[in-house]
Design a protein with these regions (language model features):
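N-terminal Rossmann-like NAD(P)+-binding domain of SDR-like oxidoreductases, especially those catalyzing
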Residues: 1-174, 333
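Active-site loop immediately N-terminal to the catalytic Tyr-X3-Lys motif
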Residues: 90, 184-185
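C-terminal substrate-binding subdomain of Rossmann-fold SDR/epimerase-dehydratase oxidoreductases
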Residues: 200-334
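Hydrophobic alpha-helix immediately C-terminal to the catalytic Tyr-X-X-X-Lys motif of short-chain
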Residues: 153, 157, 161, 191, ...
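Structural element of the ATP-grasp superfamily
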Residues: 104, 158, 195, 286-287
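A conserved pocket-lining segment of Rossmann-fold NAD(P)-dependent short-chain dehydrogenase/reductase
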Residues: 86, 139-140, 171-183, 194-218, ...
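Conserved sequence/active-site signature of Rossmann-fold short-chain dehydrogenase/reductase
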Residues: 124-125, 177-179, 223
Length: 334
């Protein structure tokens, strides 16, 4: 164990693979250790610089990885981020989020990791304070789906580990991240990626409900240095920080921007699903502590991602064969 290391879980997904690229380019004095079960990520997303372990954090022990490598910082990104699907896959959701996080917490405590950076979710806010226009870190979380509940439970567990075992942590609440290396073949999550798949396969771009839901989309490249800062800056210690784009768009607006970029005109509305109407977090704390800069407009970010999507190899689209429950499931998922 000669060289200091960072560990990234979910390393083959969007955020993990892109952060591993950033660390490889900008922090050459660190080795990059990556863990992924390859359920929603792809091995060809990562470079050969990553020391990769194919492990399932919900099932497998990982102490041997910590014993083999001098891991200073852990970025825990591994999760299955499908809020709308989670009411129909509660057990899977809980294992992949809460059980895997407990595994990581135990290892961070046992092996004296300097800091754990955990990506939670804006889903912990639920509907938020309907009198306000944005979710603030000081708001009391009130999630409305099993995914948000599990992410909030993980936050609380990490805080307890900090209080009882002196584990240093920073909790990031990212929102609506998109960009190159995103899984566009999963029909249950990542609306911008779903639309790109639909365009590439000459299917209508589907909007659930009236499309007036508000979201602040985040180009992944704008977040990477901030995530590193969450691990290393003293002022980020034991902070909860929203991280992402500052400009709200309706789903209709986002669909129209992408349709214009792709030269596409098939957009259809389907039955609404159980989700919050507006989800736009505050951002000042990320600027003050992490140095966040919202530099990429939605149009520019989608243009870049679309050029990437047109030129990557196609993959089979993922569909759940067996939901845990089917009562009340949406017609477009049957």
């Amino acid at each position: 164990m000669d060289k200091k290391c960072v560990l990234i879980t979910g390393v083959c997904g969007l955020l993990g693979s892109r952060l591993s690229d950033w660390v490889s380019e900008n922090k050459k004095d660190y080795d990059i250790i990556g863990i992924d079960n390859l359920f929603g990520g792809y091995l060809d997303n990562i470079s050969k610089d990553v020391i990769f372990y194919n492990r399932d954090l919900a099932e497998d022990k990982i102490d041997d990885i910590f014993e083999k490598h001098d891991i200073e910082y852990v970025f825990h990104f591994a999760a299955y981020a499908a809020e709308g699907l989670s009411p129909f896959m509660r057990m899977f959701n809980w294992k992949n989020n809460s059980v895997s996080t407990a595994n990581i917490i135990n290892c961070c405590i046992t092996h004296n990791v300097k800091r754990l950076v955990y990506t939670s979710s804006m889903s912990v806010y639920g509907h938020g304070d309907l009198k306000l226009n944005r979710f603030d870190e000081n708001d009391t979380p009130c999630p409305i789906d099993p995914y948000g509940i599990s992410k909030y439970a993980c936050e609380m567990d990490i805080k307890v580990a900090g209080d009882q075992h002196n584990l240093d942590w920073c909790i990031i609440r990212p929102h609506n991240i998109y960009g190159e290396k995103q899984n566009i073949w999963d029909k249950y999550r990542n609306v911008l990626g779903i639309w790109m798949y639909q365009i590439l396969h000459n299917e209508p771009m589907l909007i659930y409900g009236d499309g007036e839901q508000s979201r602040a989309f985040t180009y992944v490249g704008d977040n990477l240095e901030c995530l590193w800062n969450a691990a290393v800056l003293p002022q980020a210690s034991k902070q909860i920080i929203n991280l992402g784009g500052i400009t709200p768009y309706t789903i209709n607006d986002a669909a129209n921007i992408l349709a214009e970029i792709a030269g596409y005109n098939k957009i259809e509305h389907r039955e609404p699903r159980h989700e919050v109407k507006w989800a736009v977090p505050t951002y000042q704390k990320s600027i003050d502590i992490l140095g966040f800069k919202d530099t990429t407009s939605l149009k520019d970010g989608l243009t870049s991602m679309w050029e990437w999507a047109k030129n990557i190899k196609d993959r089979p689209r993922y569909k759940w064969e067996n939901y845990e429950i089917t009562k009340g499931i949406y017609s477009y998922w049957k």
